[in-house]
Amino acid sequence: VYFDSIQQVNDFYGIPTLHPMVSVLHLDRSESEEVAKYQVHYGIYAIWLKETKGCNLSYGRTPYDFDEQTVTSFEPGQTVTVEITDQSVRPRCIALLFHPDFLNRTQLGRNIQRYEFFSYSSTEALHLSEAEVGVFKQVLDMIEMELNHPIDNHTRELIVSNIELLLNYCL
């Protein structure tokens, strides 16, 4: 599966596209059929909060160290294998997905490389406490709230600011 655009991701998971460059995806609300094992080639940035067990990730033959209440992140050019381990339950995951062009001419775009957790060399997820999960979800809620409003002159600035806030919490 190739995810080069937000539309491709949203189509794959069966959710509406509210903005062409950014999406907040709740996997448990997805309308897509669950596939037991597949590869994802990212052309966008993706930050996943996994709240439950039920799937494994790997880069090539290297397993990704993550479990419940963990954050995983991917940058354009990365490929990951997803394996659903329990077909009876859809994993509870929330993702923030954004196209690299969305960051053009922003401070975050100029500094995105400082967030080393996007790197292939990092195969460990960020493990969160209950309180940290709450903060993570609050920031995603703010982004989602902005996505549910019509796009205006402030949309991009507000969303980019919240993306940066979320990334800073992950440092």
Describe each model-derived feature in a short phrase.
Residues 1-58, 62-65:
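Generic protein-terminus/edge-of-domain signal
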Residues 54, 72, 77-83, 103-104:
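Histidine-centered metal-chelating micro-motifs
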Residues 61-75:
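Short acidic-glycine-tyrosine-enriched beta hairpin
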Residues 83-148:
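A hydrophobic/aromatic-rich effector-binding and dimerization subdomain
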Residues 134-171:
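An amphipathic alpha-helical interaction segment
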